Amino acid sequence: MSDVLLVLNAGSSSIKFALYEAHTEPTADHLICEGGIGSLGHRPHFKVVNSDGSTRYDTYLPEGTSHDDAMAVLIGWIETTFPEHRLSAVGHRVVHGGALFDGPVDVTPEVIAQLRAFDRLAPLHQPHNVSAIEALAKLHPSLPQIACFDTAFHHRLPEVATAFALPRELTEQGVRRYGFHGLSYEYIAGRLPDVAGQAVADGRVVVAHLGAGASMCAMLRCRSIATTMGFTALDGLMMGSRCGELDPGVVLYLLEEKSMTAREIEDLLYRESGLLGVSGISDDMRTLLASDDPHACEAIELFVYRIARELGSLAAALGGLDALVFTGGIGEHASEIRRRVCEQAAWLGVTLDPDANASLSGAGRISAPDSKVSAWAIPTDEDLMIARHVWRLADGGR
């Protein structure tokens, strides 16, 4: 009986998973299958695809299926479908680790209690990340679970890059910049030498993780030195339904002049803003790019503008720029967004190769051969990054 590792990413209405062979440190070739249970709270859809993309399992679960029920269904399906394998450990994507965790950690009751303290700092993700851990602990109390944090990659940011201009006592209480999407940035940092060469990896690189959630990270020698997200995953770039950077005075105005409650403002900023709020149409970039509605065009223009502005800021933090990397769902697949960003980055030395950008599939260079700053698109794989952390911490890696 061979060991397998399970990677879980639990959200408000879904549980996504990936299953890997665990006889050696996982690579993409060790993926057995992946999928998830979506539309929880409505008509849950359970779909699994094999590593080659073919459908392995596709069904609907009863309406009213809870997150805990869905977890039991998923684990039961894995154990029934793969009797020749032993589930040896589970890795969870956990968005916020605060200042407590600088790397993956074995989950204990004490760790769970510490993670619960961050629920209000990442309301779209953290409560559901931790609930999945708790549900699985009830199902399999002896199964090792490992929490892998989106904040950990930024744990050693320079102090000046983490500080807000607030009274020192608040800073000492943990009100500071943490940064997110760290599992994605960690994966890209590991891929850079192979895709772009060691010289690029050792240089001044800005990585743009563009998806429903979006952020950017300035890397020097593949280490984070500045990032756009802050105390929460609400800060920085405009996102699918999140506002990104916002004058705090707007929040005070909404509280005092519009008599909105804190929860109403949270819903507005996290769930009703960004591409969705500006366009009034959708939080999906594909839908907006296909639309001729002027509000869709305005949303796209603002999205690109914010990226271009933050790129200049991060280049300043690096003292220059050697390479720009796109990743995430939009960064990997939306060549039009890459084109617009690169055109606005021409002053930094980015010269796009239009044909390479339009035809790229997978990882590769999209800038012209004579571009002073090279530009790349590299697919990310947060699940694989988590699987590697789990393997290293669990029995197979010891």
Curated annotation (Swiss-Prot):
The keyword Cytoplasm appears for this protein: yes
Entry's localization field: Cytoplasm
Gene3D superfamilies reported in the protein's UniProt record: 3.30.420.40
UniProt: ATP binding residues: 16, 209-213, 284-286, 329-333
Site (Transition state stabilizer): 181, 242
InterPro entries found in the cross-reference section: Ac/propionate_kinase, Aliphatic_acid_kin_short-chain, Aliphatic_acid_kinase_CS, ATPase_NBD
EC number(s) given by UniProt: 2.7.2.1
Any single Pfam family the record assigns to this protein: Acetate_kinase
One GO cellular component term: cytosol
Enzyme class: transferase
Catalysed transformations (reactions): acetate + ATP = acetyl phosphate + ADP
Pathway: Metabolic intermediate biosynthesis; acetyl-CoA biosynthesis; acetyl-CoA from acetate: step 1/2
Keyword Transferase found: yes
Summary of the function given for this chain in its UniProt record: Catalyzes the formation of acetyl phosphate from acetate and ATP. Can also catalyze the reverse reaction.
Family: Belongs to the acetokinase family.
Name of the protein in its database record: Acetate kinase
Species this chain originates from: Rhodopseudomonas palustris (strain ATCC BAA-98 / CGA009)
Species classification: Bacteria, Pseudomonadati, Pseudomonadota, Alphaproteobacteria, Hyphomicrobiales
Gene that encodes the chain: ackA
